[in-house]
């Protein structure tokens, strides 16, 4: 290991794509993390909101796509795509690209002269000339104020559960109104829980008529990346272009693309199965007799056994406490996101971010698997040019 080594922290789609592109340019690279760990912890019976065409983990030759996997294993296109299918594809991708992944987690990341010092949880240390942080969304669950001081026995985030069997016969409130909230509510019902979903705004079902009924012409409205409403999705598909528009316009587009909304295929699993209370929020939650007493913004109250938060994620650099405080303080930020240049490089030279943490500059595509290509290509070009 030398100062020419690039370290990648995270072995999800973005970390894997970056490592594959660096390998193609013969850049010495170490990647740390458990491959697809976040995805493997999801309930196995889940389906994904992303479409088949937008679930490709990027590689330099575009050879290891979900289509290629499907043809190899005689798997027809799925709508929706099952989580199990995506995980099988990801495993096949790993077998093709042959990355040497160290499944040890990083304990600390600090500056060391012009490079970086990485300490691993097993006590080993590594020197690196460049570091890519590709940690996905798992470190960033959004926890509402009312829930921050409640014990994990009474409140949990949707990402905490690989199944909901423990809630059979329990009264559970799901907070949220997007895909994760509705899918959690559906799985809770199927596990035998009594469920109510409470969302602070209206319930929005994604309207896919233009996508479904225009045949080949759908590509006029939607690129293969398929993030956001018709038309806007073409701008979102090009993160380097997105980066160049004004802050105000970027924020407006981002809100339109990632607003809480539910995929239409989930409708048959949820309608009539549980109570939905839209345009309402929980004002206060207090422990009472092994459960929770809830006060709602509409003046009503509830007594429940547990709350599941389907409230999404809020990426912030400061949440990544393994980054040395002195290093974190040097990273220029905007509302918690690192401010990045065209190479996905932060204000600290040779420190890069991809995935959800890149969304402020490069847009909502960074929150989805389909966005893994742009940072991988840019990082590989920038690093290779500097060696």
Regions found by a protein language model. Give the residues of each.
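Flavin (FAD/FMN) cofactor-binding and adjacent substrate-gating region
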Residues: 40-73, 221-243
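Flavin (primarily FAD) cofactor-binding/catalytic cores of flavoenzymes
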Residues: 2-36, 40, 78-179, 183-387
